[in-house]
């Protein structure tokens, strides 16, 4: 397995503990473009993983094969502050001009400090390409992303090796 390989992992988020997030640096949590061969279903718990040489996983994983036709962009940060998550300029550097959906996810432990459920909160959702995913102050639990709309996004960027991020559709 090469560090640049991207995996799509289907796991029950409530039963898996991603302890590796504790040791993931901010640089490895910035952004990743993920191309899937089929749309995500509303009931699919999904964890997107880009292998990083400093990150190790103790659970099994698999990834879809076939024609790549759908892309999703996810932004992630270790900060809990919506103002400190990421600058618009940095977002613009990673977001393709044709990007339709960008989801900002803050990856941090829950209030009790444990990792029994996937740590994260959606802080910004944008379906307007010209907005380039402007940061929003409102934070939503990751599980409330179920009704978020996804659009086809045919960016031409290669997969970016930047660590561990996740979402639930």
UniProtKB/Swiss-Prot annotation:
Organism: Homo sapiens
Family affiliation: Belongs to the FAM106 family.
Protein origin, superkingdom: Eukaryota
Name of this chain's protein: Protein FAM106C
